[in-house]
C-alpha cells in the first residue's frame, strides 16, 4: 500500500541521514583528537629534552619547567613504574600499575617510546579530568606531562576554532562544535564564542551520543546528532527538506 511504501521510504531516508551524520561526526572527532594529541606530545617532547639536559632532577627544576611550558603537571617515572619526582607532591611514590588510567603508560617501560591519552578522569584523583602524554627518557623510565581542562581547552580551542565552518553534510547540512561551556567554537554562520543554545535555537540539551533527534536549528526543521570528544560537542545538522527530498528521489 501507499502508506506502507511511504513509511518504508521515510525509515530509509532517516537511516541514510543517520549514517551520513555519524560519518561526518566521526571525521571531525578524529581531527580534534589528532590536533589534541599532537599538541600535548609536542609539549612533552620539549620538556623531555630539557629534563635530559638537566641531568639531576629535583622538584624545583620541574616547577620551573611547569611554569615555562604552562602545563598542569610534570612527573618523572622510574624503570619500575613508580613516580620518583613530580610537581604534584601527593604523587610521590605512586605506583603507575595501581590505576586503570595510569597503568596504560607502563608500555613505555616495554619498548614503546611515547604515548598520549584521551582527556579523561585520572586514577589518583577521582573526579578530576586531565589529559596526559609521556615520552621515554634515555636513562630509563619516562617523563609524563598533563594539563587540566582549562589549560587543555585554551590550547585546543585555537586549533578547533572554525574547523567545521566549510564542511557540508549533504547539500545544505552543516557541522557545529561547542566547548564544555556550550559556547560555539566552530559555526558556519560565524557565531564563534556565542551560546550554542541561544544562538542556534537548539532546545534539547546535549545528551546521548549518536541519537538522532528532530530540532529547529537556525530556524529550519532539521535532523540533529551529537558526538563528544576531548571535552567538545560535535553537532551534525541536516535539514528535513533534504532528508525528504532524498526519500522522493
Regions picked out by a protein language model, each given a short descriptive name:
Residues 18-59, 79-91, 140-141, 147-157, ...:
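Extracellular/periplasmic ligand-binding regions of membrane signal-transduction receptors
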Residues 82-89, 131-133, 182-190, 225-226:
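Amphipathic coiled-coil signal-relay and dimerization helices
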Residues 59-61, 88-122, 155-163, 188-218:
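Extracytoplasmic/periplasmic sensor domains and loops in membrane signaling proteins
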Residues 1-57, 129-133, 165-174, 180:
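Juxtamembrane extracytoplasmic/periplasmic/luminal helical "stalk" adjacent to the first N-terminal
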Amino acid at each position: 500500500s501507499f502508506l506502507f511504501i511511504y513509511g518504508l521510504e521515510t525509515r530509509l531516508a532517516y537511516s541514510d541521514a543517520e549514517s551520513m551524520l555519524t560519518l561526518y561526526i566521526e571525521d571531525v572527532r578524529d581531527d580534534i583528537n589528532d590536533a589534541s594529541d599532537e599538541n600535548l606530545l609536542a609539549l612533552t617532547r620539549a620538556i623531555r629534552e630539557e629534563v635530559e639536559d638537566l641531568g639531576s632532577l629535583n622538584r624545583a627544576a620541574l616547577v620551573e619547567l611547569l611554569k615555562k611550558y604552562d602545563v598542569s603537571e610534570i612527573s618523572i617515572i622510574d624503570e619500575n613504574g613508580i613516580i620518583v619526582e613530580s610537581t604534584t607532591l601527593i604523587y610521590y611514590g605512586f605506583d603507575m600499575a595501581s590505576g586503570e588510567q595510569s597503568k596504560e603508560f607502563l608500555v613505555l617501560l616495554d619498548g614503546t617510546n611515547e604515548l598520549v591519552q584521551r582527556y579523561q578522569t585520572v586514577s589518583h584523583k577521582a573526579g578530576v579530568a586531565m589529559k596526559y602524554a609521556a615520552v621515554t627518557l634515555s636513562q630509563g623510565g619516562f617523563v609524563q606531562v598533563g594539563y587540566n581542562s582549562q589549560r587543555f581547552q585554551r590550547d585546543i580551542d585555537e586549533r578547533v576554532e572554525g574547523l567545521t565552518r566549510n564542511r557540508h553534510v549533504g547539500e545544505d547540512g552543516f557541522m557545529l562544535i561547542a566547548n564544555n561551556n556550550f559556547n560555539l567554537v566552530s559555526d558556519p554562520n560565524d557565531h564563534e564564542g556565542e551560546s550554542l543554545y541561544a544562538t542556534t535555537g537548539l532546545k534539547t540539551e546535549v545528551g546521548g551520543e549518536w541519537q538522532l533527534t528532530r530540532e529547529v536549528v537556525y530556524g529550519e526543521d532539521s535532523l540533529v546528532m551529537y558526538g563528544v570528544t576531548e571535552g567538545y560537542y560535535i553537532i551534525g545538522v541536516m535539514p528535513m527538506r533534504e532528508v525528504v527530498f532524498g526519500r522522493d528521489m
